[in-house]
Amino acid sequence: MQCYTELLPPTGVTHSLSIPFLSATATNLVVVKTSVLQIFSLLNVSCSAEGEIIAAKSARPDQLQSTKLILEREYSLSGTVSDLCRVKLLKTKSGGDAILLAFRNAKLSLVEWDPERYGISTISIHYYERDDITRSPWVPDLSSCGSILSVDPSSRCAVFNFGIRNLAILPFHQPGDDLVMGDYESDSQKQSHEHEMDDSAGNSKSKEGAVHQTPYASSFVLPLTALDSAILHPVSLAFLYEYREPTFGILYSQIATSNSLLHERKDAIFYTVFTLDLEQRASTMLLSVTRLPSDLFKVVALPPPVGGALLIGYNELVHVDQAGKTNAVGVNEFSRQVSTFSMADQSELALRLEGCVVELLGNSSGDLLLALSSGTMVLVHFKLDGRSVSGISIRPLPGHAGGNILKAAASASASLGSDKVFFGSEDAESVLLGWSLSSSNARKSRSESKRIEKDHEEGSDDSESEEDVYEDDLYSAAPDTPALGHRLSVAPSTFASYKFKVHDVLPNTAPLRDIALGQPAMPVEDTGSHLDNICSELELVAAYGSNGNGGLVVMKRELEPVVKASLNVGPIHGVWTASIALGSAAKPMSGDQTNIEEWRQYVILTKPQTIDKEESEVFIVDGLNLKPFKAPEFNPNNDISIQVGTLSNRKRVVQVLRNEVRSYDSDLELAQIYPVWDEDTSDERMALSASLADPYIAILRDDSTLLLLQADDSGDLDELDMSDILGNEKWLSCCLYWDTTHIFSPRGHASQQSTDCGLLLFLLSTDCRLFIYRLPEQQLMSVIEGVDCLPPILSTELPKRSTTREILSEAIVANLGDSWNPLPHLILRTDNDDLVIYKPFISSVEEDGDPHCLRFVKETNHVLPRIPPDSDTNISDKEPSNHRPLCILPDISGYSAVFMPGTSASFIFKTSRSCPHILRLRGGVVRSLSDFDFTDPSLGRGFIYVDSKDVVRICQLPPETIYDYSWTLKKVAIGEHVDHLAYSISSETYVLGTSHSADFKLPEDDELHPEWRNEAISFLPELRQCCLKVVHPKTWTVIDSYTLGPDEEIMAVKNMNLEVSENTHERKNMIVVGTALARGEDIPARGCIYVFEVIKVVPDPEKPETDRKLKLIGKELVKGAVTALSEIGGQGFLIAAQGQKCMVRGLKEDGSLLPVAFMDVQCYVNVLKELKGTGMCIVGDAFKGIWFAGYSEEPYKMSLFGKDLEYPEVVAADFLPDGDKLFILVADSDCNLHVLQYEPEDPMSSNGDKLLVRSKFHMGHFTSTLTLLPRTTASYEIPSADSDSMEVDPRITPQQVLITSQSGSIGIVTSIPEESYRRLSALQSQLANTVEHPCGLNPRAYRAIESDGTAGRGMLDGNLLYQWLSMSKQRRMEIAARVGAHEWEIKADLEAVGGDGLGYL
């Protein structure tokens, strides 16, 4: 019984789309990362000449402009997206366009943006999984077939090619259409198993007045042979521009193309254009072009002024216009050999077009930008003569113009406006590029654009006036008038001078190829001896990327700050900082533009004395040192400090105590005392919490009343007269916030003061209503109801079902995100330290000043708070029991964040490319934290905190780190393709197996092939040149390398503890490398096993980390490629898969490897692992499934125990012991995870010869590694000291399996006990049926859980289970009641199946 949970989402971009989605005038970028849908907006920002972004309030009009991507919403989909297109409907909720998504297994989903919910809404979902269509003995399964989705440019219909030869056509209602299919439904259509959800905004109405219940008409499925009987092998299709009826072009062949049969099947591709009659469900062939090159693989429709279609092949580009005229150009010397098709010769370019991505540059010339698989960018220009294309010219983009921006192949592209283009990649970072023309070309382009717009308007008028005359024309609505002909002749005869620059990037760690666990290197800075609990025991390092983008990524489960200084001054309860101005000028909010001597920063540490007394100790910051500062007037009564801050433009230090508010000058001399008690009634009052925002202080007292103070120009505080509601209402929490975005303000008020910031007061009443007031006029802006119900949407309306409510302890509004674009968020803290994050948005724009338009949408948070252990609950008897409030950090290393102190110490982070998420701080309990200004401008702004061990640390965030996820990621560029990775324990370094591309030329000295000497070829093939590299983890630089032969490829790199002496039986940690020497399919492959030791040498004095070097200890040439390696047994031997044998070998003193045992295997062994210390191993074959074998040492023998008779194509595998049960996890090539069990006592296993299949689980990602890891105890599982907990056998260590994938995602499989499995299984069933899933997909069908029907149990989906945490309090309790469990039991189970079991990372 296991559960699969995704710890990190996929990062590689597979699809992208430019669309006005959030509104009719918006420019949005929709990005798909395998099964994650992200919606971005574009934001123009100012930047300096060095590229540093400048905050909006500090920007000047003369500064450079850049465009950034801002993530609006993100969705995890229960399906693998295969394509997506833009559809313009008659009516949508937002007024923008809709998105049509195609999924694996023939599904289509139509979604729109819902501004009332600030998210996507599913209009319909269409299934095309009919058995009579997809089931055929000679047709592959749907999961093995690709699909093609294309939408007509006028959005009249969409075509979906699935299952090789099936074509689904989905019509859409448009203004002026003459479809009469609304009520028509044939018998075949009734059986199409199409499910269409009527969740759209209402009925759609065309200009003719016909009312449609849905924005689409009934779809139908046709075989491609119904269009033409010759379409047997479709290649690509796309809808074309400038046709009156929906018209698409399709590439196909009558026979399968083959490079090996090129001399017989040369020029076998056809290109045919069909027009569709949606009313009659018929098609008409308009033109056909025959005998095209056989390597064509893609159709790209071109808009005006070029028009027609561009056909892309491996070696050439072919343009076909609307009349069937062709123009072609060859881009390498093989174009003449593979085809006799007439084409221009540009073979000197030597381009490889396989896997290229093409995008239109948004100007009037019709130029295209090609991104090649190597990352090189190429410009394609069409020579136009009227409406006719007279030629194609190609030019690589030079490096100085941005031609080397892309580091690897692009997988998707989207044109964003007139000067921006986006390229997504699965192998490198996705980039948003901006381009510009040279000054002369820019002036010419602007003049041409104006003339085109003018002529286009004239042409449109002509077309409208003569519409009836040309109604039977299949092409554009107007004939080729001289004006239009002149309009299309706009392309210059020469290339424009383009220059590209990077606006923004989306980080990517895909594909993850290999992982290793190593010990983290100690920081270089000398920070004292207080680092024991802020560094992880191990760090997870993965090899990522492809080709020149390869490198390492260091993954940390928790944030490990860079400690700049630390000290221990005894018991500390709280820490505050205050930066005070010594001169007359105020400190700038961004940048260090004034002399540092004009500012002084104090650090106040509070030491507990009794339960209601504490001592305040003041320090002054001098560099990284804290020097004691004598301030006798600072809290002389040892009262409890509630808050410390600055007012009066940072000229006054204010200390809010329990009984009074004290104001100090720059030398901390007392300036004013303001009592907290009620002066009118003389009732004694005490402050519980406070919020400061210059010039106001909001104080919440112990009787739940509010005290509002305001500082005048001189800095003196005075109480503000409050309205009746403010003064008489009982409050639970208060927060002051400067509204720079004006999202909380009425639009009329915001437009009048668009340049000013409004100060708002947020108050949470005792009945959990959120009041929003504008200061100083105390105007009530809005009242949000039912905050403690935690619904998905917070609004002025009370939730319908609100009987069950959460106990809230704090509510704040703070900025989150990059410091140049911070966005407000409402953060709620519950009584048990759960954090709930809401994002404000405007839901309606019907009436100015309407308070009902303000709403809050709930953000996803799957991080559970920790249960405090007994050692942390009683920290000190003298420590005050006041609440540790959330700490707002306006700027911490360029980010606006919020910190939660306590047992679950964590930051709430957000970047422009991510949603708000929780980042836990490494270490134990954090008692208090505050921001910290470094005197060195290069260090920026950090933070200072005190932990439960009374250690005060001054820290900053780790530089060059990605904070977009719940784990921190640090990328280390290697510059080569990294396939294999191992950690050398003895030297504490990482050994990498890398490769780079190198040209291959046939050897001229080969005696068997003397004709090779006469080969004259300049376009050489590329092979991989492999090398071993040693990387030091302190500096992450390569310190040594070992180059292999030109035809030798690294297949495995492992760190093993081998016996190095037969006499002394000494054992050492060695690096063992398995290689393959392949020189062609007609020559048997050989292999070699290398044994290296990373030895210590004298380092370079300037580079002390270069003290390690690879030393070759042994080398053994063997027959067959060495494809897998593993340590085995207890005597220091290794087992190697060499060819069709698995052989156990021992290292001799002369460096040779002596074989002692072997076992014959099947075809190609790519997985070989031992259950450490047992001799039991698994042998995974890429074609013949998994074997379970054993090795014995007396005598030396290999024995086969059992095997899987289903023969999956094994990609990765590993053991998963669970008590006395032994499971084997196998990942196949279809993204499935098989759970097998070795159970010889089961009669179904034939005495153990057959491995029992317990379940199958579809992960949706192509697996790269499976790694067995020990599991630590989660906080919910730690028994209390006084509880009567059951005894657990300490010898049984729980295990889990970490899974990495080619898409960049990381998941974990955890074994769970019977009781937890039953609870979570019932919870999963409830969630699958009750939760509204994005795009209308079915998570149960997506995971396709199967079992053997007896003792098998389906694997649980952790992603689905964690959605329970995102529900409202009422729904959570209802579902928990149906499951028959308490809320804390479900939370404990969810923590157990999450990443908390990786406590050592």
Curated annotation (Swiss-Prot):
Gene3D superfamilies: 1.10.150.910, YVTN repeat-like/Quinoprotein amine dehydrogenase. This is Protein cft1. The keyword Nucleus applies. Residues 181-208, 444-472 are annotated as: Disordered. GO terms for molecular function: RNA binding. PANTHER family: DNA REPAIR/RNA PROCESSING CPSF FAMILY. It is found in: Nucleus. It comes from Aspergillus clavatus (strain ATCC 1007 / CBS 513.65 / DSM 816 / NCTC 3887 / NRRL 1 / QM 1276 / 107). Disulfide bonds: none annotated. One of its GO terms (biological process) is mRNA processing. Belongs to the CFT1 family.
